[in-house]
Amino acid sequence: MALKDLFSGFFVVEEEDDELEAPPEENEQQERQQPKQQAQSQNQFTEQPRNVNSERPRSIQSVPKKQSTRLQQSSGERKYQMNNTTSKNNARNVVNMNNQEQENYDFTQESSKMCLFEPRVFSDTQDIADELKNRRATLVNLQRIDKVSAKRIIDFLSGTVYAIGGDIQRVGSDIFLCTPDNVEVAGSITDQIENMEYQGE
């Protein structure tokens, strides 16, 4: 009832001629209340200044609100209420670490996939970048493509790997390993690659 009382004087609605038929008891109550409401709405309408340019009066009119009691509270009470709400919010931020470890384990198993690519044209590079964006490691073999296109592909993949925070490593002559940020590569074979290049020349 308190909520109803709060909004009882907020809007004034004028009765329209098109009314649905109500049971006889309700008709009697409505007939008693109708003159009171009409007189009340006419008094409020005459109190408001009339707008010359308006074509017809509106059926719903706003009534000024009473000042809320919450604005009358002292600042000390407000600070106390703020402190109570923040302590309740902090209590809800507790996270179960076992569930988080299980989710991380599931995600690691799900993303432990490596894709092998041997692009023939530069447009195949977009497929490699899509796999990197999906957090999958890719191994790219550039032995069957010309040197100019291979350089363009490596430049493109270097930018992609940089954007996602991953890494690109050379693991053979014209073979590159591109990894996203969730994959860590241990060890290096740089000496072996350099020896292979010197022997090939």
From Swiss-Prot:
| Keywords annotated in UniProt | Cell cycle, Cell division, Cytoplasm, Septation
Biased composition (Polar residues) is annotated at: 59-88
Disordered: region residues: 1-94
Residue ranges annotated as compositionally biased, kind Low complexity, are 35-44
In which family does this protein belong, per the annotation? Belongs to the SepF family.
A Pfam family this chain is assigned to: SepF
Top-level taxon of the source organism: Bacteria
Biological process (GO) annotations held by this record are: division septum assembly; FtsZ-dependent cytokinesis
> What does the UniProt record say this protein does?
Cell division protein that is part of the divisome complex and is recruited early to the Z-ring. Probably stimulates Z-ring formation, perhaps through the cross-linking of FtsZ protofilaments. Its function overlaps with FtsA.
**Subcellular location(s) of the protein:** Cytoplasm
Look up keyword Cytoplasm and say if it applies: yes
Gene3D superfamilies under this entry?
A: SepF-like protein (3.30.110.150)
Protein name, UniProt field: Cell division protein SepF
Its predominant location is cytoplasm
Q: Where is the composition biased (Acidic residues)?
A: 13-28
